[in-house]
From Swiss-Prot:
NCBIfam families membership: hybrid_clust, PRK05290.1
Taxonomic lineage: Archaea, Methanobacteriati, Methanobacteriota, Methanomada group, Methanococci
SUPFAM superfamilies for this protein: Prismane protein-like
Function: Catalyzes the reduction of hydroxylamine to form NH(3) and H(2)O.
Residues at which hybrid [4Fe-2O-2S] cluster binds: 239, 263, 307, 398, 426, 451, 486, 488
Full protein name: Hydroxylamine reductase
Source organism: Methanococcus vannielii (strain ATCC 35089 / DSM 1224 / JCM 13029 / OCM 148 / SB)
Homology family: Belongs to the HCP family.
Molecular function GO terms recorded: 4 iron, 4 sulfur cluster binding; hydroxylamine reductase activity; metal ion binding; peroxidase activity
Cofactor binding: number and manner: Binds 1 [4Fe-4S] cluster. Binds 1 hybrid [4Fe-2O-2S] cluster.
Keyword Zinc-finger belongs to the record: no
Pfam (any one): Prismane
Catalytic activity, EC: 1.7.99.1
């Protein structure tokens, strides 16, 4: 095992025996086998020009399952490997993809396994390693692309669930899997692939934005209760809005309240969910606090996506996972063939539990996605022209458990009163309960939504560029101080780079999988920087 795909990797250099996230050595290796298998499917599909929805969804959902804090279940990973091998072999049989027809075939195409034991043996082999080739810059470029398409697949999965897809994005995922396995690719070609990944991340986020807004309406300014009521409750975490919709429909009239947790908070901003009387508020804060918060919630918890922390015994029997999320010996809500899910077991469980324990009281405000902010465009533009707003500070991204992330709370507190924070993702929990006031009625914290809603922040920036008649988005009074944690944040970073955004400050640390030479390239081409101290960065960003 060598895993350094997240920001919290041990000593910043990689987890080698067990992940900080809780992922075991054998699970990490099996996930590498799964990715290896996906490369084989992509290769055969690309060579033959044959694909279908089953192949596409298998690749997308499998890559999503390998993201940090999504799936810890070896049985689940092995079953996906088996299915992948069958899809690949059926495709080869159907089209006769032999060396004579398709040329010399790589091992990930020809490899097969008759049983679980052979899969476990493959997990020990060198072929599956992401540490190939020996050149660290080539490895770095390959990993940046791989982690970027993992994040892309998370967003595409959610769009697919709502019935939205894009053939060109699906083609690119396969192309990227093949290209990062091609030893003949030059550093220049792999660098171009990194930026091409950013292009398709933008397309995917746009697709998901369309899926969400056409399904549930455009987010609008909303006050969200952070206290509790006295009824039985169900807590839903993750990002899947369709799961939430089904849960709300099934709990209607049961007397059970539904609370969001962490990245599900922005669901409250969508008009479609405001009709549910039992959709009562948000419970707790960021994902890494769940061991305390899940315990005190008292009722069942539904994990629709990441971030799942290995559940403690005190509440493990109340955790339900669904979709691509997995953990050994935790109850699963399966998806039916028509895409529906039956949450009746969760509902009956909730009736046996005490109401949630109150953690805090009050309200937080959000719903500032692109449609809502652009509706306020005249007010925003006037505030900038008058000097009432001097800077917009994009502080989007991820939260995490390390103490170094207190930097973002301190940074938000010390911003001058003429600065407005634009945020999306769970990074918001470092400052979204601070009372920073407003500027002429414009709140100084504008929350666009989930991490994928960084797309909204990009749209806002591009529209403001037009409104001010500027040639370059970097001429706007917008600076970027972004926190990353896992692969969706990598995808967002690549999207911003593709859009030409420069002078991004990324923290709390730069990714270990970026080699010194590749880091130098990013600094020279995009002026990408790390963070230092609050005061130093404040002076640098607000100069």
């Amino acid at each position: 095992m060598l895993c350094h795909q997240c920001q919290e990797t041990i000593k910043g250099t990689g987890c080698t025996q067990m992940g900080v996230c809780g992922k075991k050595d054998n699970t990490a290796n099996l996930q590498d086998v799964l990715i290896y298998t996906l490369k084989g499917i992509a290769y055969v599909s690309n060579k033959t020009g044959i694909t279908n929805n089953e192949i596409d969804s298998h690749i997308v959902d499998s890559l999503f399952a390998t993201i940090t804090n999504v799936n810890f279940d070896d049985k689940y990973i092995i079953e996906r490997i088996k299915k992948g091998l069958k899809l690949k072999n059926d495709l080869r049989t159907k089209c006769g993809c032999t060396p004579e027809k398709c040329g010399e075939l790589p091992d990930f195409v020809t490899w097969d396994a008759k049983n679980d034991l052979e899969i476990l043996e493959k997990a020990k082999s060198k072929e599956i390693s992401l540490e190939i080739p020996e050149n660290e810059d080539m490895r770095s470029l390959r990993k940046i692309t791989l982690y970027g398409i993992k994040g892309l697949c998370a967003y595409l999965h959610h769009a697919n669930v709502l019935g939205y897809n894009d053939e060109e994005i699906q083609k690119f995922i396969k192309k990227a899997l093949i290209d990062i396995s091609d030893d003949l690719k030059s550093p220049e070609e792999l660098t171009a692939l990194v930026l091409e990944t950013g292009k398709y991340v933008v397309d995917t986020m746009a697709l998901l934005d369309k899926a969400n807004t056409e399904s549930y309406g455009n987010p609008e300014i909303t006050e969200v209760n952070i206290g509790v009521k006295n009824n039985h409750g169900i807590l839903i975490s993750g990002h899947d809005l369709k799961d939430l919709e089904q849960l709300l429909n099934q709990t209607k009239g049961t007397g059970i309240d539904v609370y969001t947790h962490s990245e599900m908070l922005p669901a409250h901003y969508y008009p479609a969910f405001k009709k549910y009387d039992n959709f009562v508020g948000n419970y707790g804060g960021s994902w890494y606090l769940q061991k305390t918060e899940f315990d005190s919630f008292n009722g069942p918890i539904v994990m629709t996506t990441n971030c799942l922390v290995p559940p403690a015994d005190e509440y493990k029997n109340r955790v339900y996972v669904t979709g691509v999320v997995g953990y050994p010996d935790v109850k699963t809500i399966p998806v039916n063939e028509d895409g529906t899910k039956d949450f009746s077991k969760v509902i009956e469980h909730a009736k046996l539990c005490k109401p949630p324990k109150e953690l805090e009281t009050g309200k937080i405000v959000g719903g500032f996605a692109h449609n809502q902010v652009l509706a306020l465009a005249d007010k925003v533009i006037d505030a900038v022209k008058s000097g009432a707003i001097k800077k917009f500070v994009v502080m989007a991204g991820c939260d995490g458990r390390h103490k170094t992330r207190e930097y973002y709370t301190d940074f938000a507190k010390k911003l001058p009163k003429d600065a407005v924070i634009l945020t999306a993702g769970c990074a918001k929990y470092r400052y979204n309960k601070l009372d920073l006031g407003d500027i002429g009625g414009i709140p100084r914290i504008l929350d666009a939504g989930q991490c994928n809603d960084c797309y909204s922040l990009a749209v806002i920036a591009l529209k403001l560029k037009e409104a001010f008649g500027l040639n370059d988005v970097n001429e706007l009074p917008i600076v970027y101080n972004i926190a990353w944690y896992e692969q969706k944040a990598v995808a967002v970073l690549l999207a911003l780079l593709y859009l030409g955004i420069q002078n991004i400050h990324l923290g709390p640390t730069l990714p270990d999988f970026i080699s010194p030479n590749v880091a130098k390239l990013l600094v020279e081409k995009f002026k990408l920087n790390g963070i230092t101290t609050v005061n130093e960065d404040m002076n640098l960003l607000l100069e």
